[in-house]
Curated annotation (Swiss-Prot):
SUPFAM superfamilies: F1F0 ATP synthase subunit C. The chain crosses the membrane at residues 8-28, 52-72. This is ATP synthase subunit c. CDD domains: ATP-synt_Fo_c_ATP5G3 (cd18182). The record marks E58 as: Reversibly protonated during proton transport. It comes from the Bacteria. It is a multi-pass membrane protein. The keyword Cell membrane applies.
Length: 75
């Protein structure tokens, strides 16, 4: 197989990291809304933990994006 073709396959596989980040953030906020619906008094405490968790998941998506950009332009 050509080296350029392998490069584009690797870029396509790196995009799955961004897909995982999107699904992870959706799952986090869905669980938060379910928790607030069950116990509205815990909203303030939940928000801080949810934002920290969402930031960690988003960092993984951004790292996948940076990896894809590095593969496109540097490799």
């Amino acid at each position: 197989m050509d080296l350029v073709a392998l490069k584009f396959i690797a870029i396509g596989l790196a995009v799955f990291g961004m897909l995982g980040a999107g699904l992870g953030i959706a799952n986090i906020f869905s669980a938060m809304l379910n928790g607030i619906a069950r116990n509205p008094e815990s909203e303030g405490k939940m928000k801080s933990y949810v934002y920290i968790g969402a930031a960690m998941v988003e960092i993984m998506g951004l790292l996948a994006f940076v990896l894809a950009m590095l593969l496109i332009f540097a490799a």
